[in-house]
Amino acid sequence: MNSIDKTQRITQSDALPGRSTPMPVARLHVVHEHSMTHVPDHMSVAIFAMGCFWGAERLFWQQPGIYSTAAGYIGGYTPNPTYREVCSGQTDHAEAVRVVFDPATISYSQLLQLFWENHDPAQGMRQGGDIGSQYRSAIYTLTPEQEQAAQASLQRFQQAMRENSDGRAISTEIEPAGPFYYAEEDHQQYLHKNPNGYCGLGGIGVCLPPPR
């Protein structure tokens, strides 16, 4: 049996079958003590993939105006995957964070700034020492306005990289959000439960310029 190259995307026909039963989800976010699934009427949702979801989730829950965050899987084929399945490279999912936020306090543009400035968006199917398609950089949009803002921010960050003598091409994917599958309970708010746990999050020292 040939080993799987986890840095290569797979086709749907090669994906694991998954299951019809969703992962159990805790009722409350352990940091904010809000619902893990409900989105209040005045709130919005954003989804970002920027490497290991442990550090990415903490980055967002620490911001003002955040109602809840959740670690999960998106962008692949396998329904209701497990962490082990995602790590196998046979689901095509990315590790991601679902952010429920109050746009009156923190804007989507501010979330994009956090995204770009806190990881390396030009590493393809890896993030630092974390190697595999699950660690790819991606923005999953839920509205046309998010799509437009994300695309514009990519162009601004690419230009900022060039101006900082970084000629690499950004590999971040910007796609409409498909199903978001919650990760297992031990991955939710992981770095709150394990303050000394692994966090691979880190930017490249480039700031996102504001829109002109």
From Swiss-Prot:
Give the protein's function. Has an important function as a repair enzyme for proteins that have been inactivated by oxidation. Catalyzes the reversible oxidation-reduction of methionine sulfoxide in proteins to methionine.
Q: Which InterPro entries match?
A: Met_Sox_Rdtase_MsrA_dom, Met_Sox_Rdtase_MsrA_sf, MsrA_MetSO_reductase
Residues of the region (Disordered) are 1-21
Tell me what reaction this enzyme catalyses.
L-methionyl-[protein] + [thioredoxin]-disulfide + H2O = L-methionyl-(S)-S-oxide-[protein] + [thioredoxin]-dithiol; [thioredoxin]-disulfide + L-methionine + H2O = L-methionine (S)-S-oxide + [thioredoxin]-dithiol
Q: What is this protein called?
A: Peptide methionine sulfoxide reductase MsrA
Identify the enzyme class: oxidoreductase
> What does the record give under GO molecular function?
L-methionine-(S)-S-oxide reductase activity; peptide-methionine (S)-S-oxide reductase activity
Mind telling me which HAMAP family this protein's record contains? MsrA
Record's family? Belongs to the MsrA Met sulfoxide reductase family.
Catalytic residues per the record? Answer: 52
Write the Enzyme Commission number(s) for this entry.
1.8.4.11
A single GO CC term for this protein reads: cytoplasm
Q: Which residue windows does the record flag with biased composition (Polar residues)?
A: 1-14
Q: Which UniProt keywords apply?
A: Oxidoreductase
GO-annotated biological processes? cellular response to oxidative stress; protein modification process
Q: Which organism is it from?
A: Pectobacterium atrosepticum (strain SCRI 1043 / ATCC BAA-672) (Erwinia carotovora subsp. atroseptica)
